[in-house]
Structure formats: structure tokens, C-alpha cells
Amino acid sequence: MNPDTDSPIMPLFIILGKLTDKAVQKMRDAKERDEKAEEIIQAAGGRLISHYYTFGRYDFVATVELPSAEILASVIIDITRWGTVGTETMTALLPEDIYKMAH
């Protein structure tokens, strides 16, 4: 349960992303792309929890809540269609969920 709302928490996903050359060449458009991606997530019934640009193997990391893995796939397809990012995703579980499973 979400302690702030007493509602069930949606599945949590971590998105690791790499920017394409097209995205790097148009970094001035990054804010607009990020806002559009958040709109897509929200329209799918989800929530962007965090988003960071990173240095190293991946160019950005985002954490999102979405109703299902199928909806995540749809969101990723919509976003990668722009040709500006490639992604790798992971399902994330809260420590409390793991503790419950261990009993």
C-alpha cells in the first residue's frame, strides 16, 4: 500500500536509456522530449517518479509506475518511435515486498 494514499502501488519499472546520435545533435530539444515522454506515461495511467541524466553506460535512468508490463511496453514503443532513445527496462520491487515473499 502507498502510505500517502492507502491505495495499492502500481508495478514499478526502471528504464535505462541511451540517447541516439539524433538526440545528441538536438539536445536543445531535450526538455520538450522529456515533457512529452512524461505526458505519454501519464496518459497510460502511470507516473514518472524520477528521471536523471547519467554518465557512463547509460545516458539516463527513469523510474516509473505503470499499471502493467504490457502498458510499459506500449509506452516504450511510443517513446522509442521518435528515434532518439534506446531503452532497457527492469521490474523493480520494494524491499518490503521481498520481505513478505521471504516469509
Regions found by a protein language model. Give the residues of each.
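A compositional/biophysical signature of low hydrophobicity enriched in polar/charged and small residues
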Residues: 2-103
